[in-house]
Amino acid sequence: MFDATTILGYKADGKAVIGGDGQVTFGDTVLKSNATKIRTLYEGKILAGFAGSTADAFNLFDMFEGILAEKRGDLFKSVIGFSKMWRKDKHLRQLEAMMIVLNTEHIFILSGTGDVVEPQDGKIAAIGSGGNYAISAARALDKHANLEPRELVQESLEVAGDLCIYTNKNIKILEL
């Protein structure tokens, strides 16, 4: 289901950064190498990225943007409201997508089952087929290197691109 991408979110030093590769695959075929899987939400104050079904992800983005507007951009309240809505609707629970949403204060993973996970370290999250490679690289770089947040995301996604066949190095990055 998620064999199509790598998305990495990172927040540190008062900054929030999200990045994703550009590869879209269907089975064993690369359909597109320059897709955009990250975007800003709520007047550019929230970053979001998705892995999984593109159609499902765009539905999730739209629904989440509606809740963000309702909660006036409060990310914490929005993810809780989103999860409650998701759990009540059996059709939403069938969506095959995951999202990372973050700002300079919070970072969350929203799963296709309506779960909301705040990473244990509170600053690094990754999803998609190359997510484990990207998060491993990001944790090591966060601990041992003195990189700017944007550089850390770039380098970590490049590691994932080297190792995951469903991830390429056509990386796009957004920053707050």
Curated annotation (Swiss-Prot):
One of its GO terms (biological process) is proteolysis involved in protein catabolic process. InterPro entries: ATP-dep_Prtase_HsIV_su (IPR022281), Ntn_hydrolases_N (IPR029055), Proteasome_sua/b (IPR001353), Proteasome_suB-type (IPR023333). Protease subunit of a proteasome-like degradation complex believed to be a general protein degrading machinery. Its main location: cytoplasm. The gene is hslV. PANTHER family: ATP-DEPENDENT PROTEASE SUBUNIT HSLV, METALLOPROTEASE TLDD. Its EC number is 3.4.25.2. This is ATP-dependent protease subunit HslV. HAMAP family: HslV. Keywords: Allosteric enzyme, Cytoplasm, Hydrolase, Metal-binding, Protease, Sodium, Threonine protease. It catalyses: ATP-dependent cleavage of peptide bonds with broad specificity. The active site is at 5. One of its GO terms (molecular function) is threonine-type endopeptidase activity. It is an enzyme of class 3 (hydrolase). Belongs to the peptidase T1B family. HslV subfamily. A double ring-shaped homohexamer of HslV is capped on each side by a ring-shaped HslU homohexamer. The assembly of the HslU/HslV complex is dependent on binding of ATP.
